Amino acid sequence: LVRSSNEGTTLLHQQADIIRALGIAPSFDAAAETERRVAFLADYLRTTALRAYVLGISGGVDSLTAAMLAQTAVSRLREHGHTAEFVAVRLPYGVQADEADAQKALAAIRPDRTVTIDIKPAADAMLAEVRREAGELFEAARVDFHLGNIKARQRMIAQYALAGAVSGLVIGTDHAAEALMGFFTKFGDGAADILPLSGLTKRRVRAIAKHIGAPQELIDKVPTADLESNAPLRPDEDAYGVTYDEIDDFLEGKAIAELARQRILTMYTASAHKRALPVTPE
């Protein structure tokens, strides 16, 4: 495929615009970024006059990294005389296939408090009621997809209920790679009060995780949203159609294969509504 110089320039400008919009820094130092984000979490909690951070722990590197940053931040606040705690929340849908990884994550985080809430009864009840009242609107082939979104939103309902009980804020785990691909559920895992991993590529999240002492096996774990009951532990990259290395290279301004670039741009455009606030009339 041969492109004109004008078309190539347009694509480079588009890539640069996306990098700027998602806040990816041109350089990265794991130690400096760790400190900056811990300070960010500590300062924000202190200025809100709230007393806790709440975060769902899945067993993946994103929630593990965000949680370790948060636990460090609240510990620092307590050292300076402030009331602060970190509440880790396990939110399995029945029995989680990789529960052992979630427990390893908790052991690494050492949260002030751990709460476990099974979302299966609530998620199943909601799906059943919606299907009972609007079943003809549901394509049979997409029921599992809809249930996956219900799971994500039910998890956020639980986290906000818990945050209200402890005067806390909910932490989200969204980072630049997921934001680029729109790989989150609106008002589910996409809902949060604070995003300590914002502006990071996946490899940079892993670099911070390594710097703060996360278990290597969880750093290297194949990422999965694990929302589909019919495809448990489906890798993120399978859903993307591109690899995290390709996504990260794109976000770091590097050249990637044309098919991968087009896939990324297509998903970025299609998911624009997910990254926007609710639209209003002018």
PLM segments and residue spans:
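Peripheral terminal appendages
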Residues: L1-L55, V61, T65-L69, G190, ...
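ATP-dependent adenylation/nucleotidyltransferase module used to activate substrates
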Residues: L11-L180
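Predominant activation on well-ordered alpha-helical scaffold segments within soluble catalytic domains
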Residues: A67, Q71, Q103, Y160, ...
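Catalytic subdomain that performs nucleotidyl-dependent activation
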Residues: E85, P111, D144-L147, T173-G241
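Proline-rich low-complexity regions
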Residues: P92, P196, P215, P223, ...
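Alpha-helix boundary/capping residues
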Residues: I109, E129-E133, F187, I212, ...
